[in-house]
Amino acid sequence: AIVIDPGQAEPVIAYLEEHELELTSIWTTHHHHDHIGGVAELQESYPMTHLVAHTEHNVDEDQTIKDGSTVSAWGCAAQVWDVSGHTASHMAYILDIDGQKHCFCGDTLFSAGCGRVFTGTIEQLHESFKRLNGLPAETLLYPAHEYTASNLRFGLSIEPTNEAMQQALIQAEEKTAQGGPTLPV
């Protein structure tokens, strides 16, 4: 299995054990603790795990990545894109699985929102949005956090009559009330 941005080890280990999977690779998008907090414990539990990260992600990576790198595991190859803005060294992983594009974009882009600018710049974030916007429309986006409903509530506090946001919030709340995710988008 490949794990992206393990903020905690325990839920990952529980999932792997429940589904009888072996962790072989960890990929990180950026250095914030809620994305790398479980890396060390996962490496202890699965010592053969291959860690893929940018040099500024504060982990001891086996493979250093940058914009344009390619990473692979279990027959899946991903293009690495620099999508800085939230942080100065934020990476995304773009996979093509059976003709369907999948983008793991960390905190650069959320459903109905984006990550705050910390060590990056607003100009970098804008360039990253333009780059991500160039992906095919049918690309599935996997943001790192499930903030859809809260982002839509915030949007509605600014534009309370926005019918598209109202409808999207109803759908998001229905999905989460049933125990389902609103992601990917």
Q: What residue ranges belong to the model's regions?
A:
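Active-site metal-binding loops of divalent metal-dependent hydrolases
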Residues: P6-Q8, H31, E56, H86-T87, ...
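Accessory terminal helices/loops
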Residues: E127-L140, Y147-V185
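Generic enzyme active-site microenvironment
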Residues: V3, C105, P143
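Ligand/cofactor pocket segment of small-molecule handling proteins
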Residues: T70-D82, T87-I122
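Short active-site oxyanion
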Residues: A1-I2, L23-S25, E138-L140
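Short beta-strand-to-turn element immediately C-terminal to the catalytic PLP-Schiff-base lysine
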Residues: I4, I94-D96, G155-L156
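Active-site HxH/HxHxD metal-binding segment of metal-dependent hydrolases
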Residues: P6-D82, K101
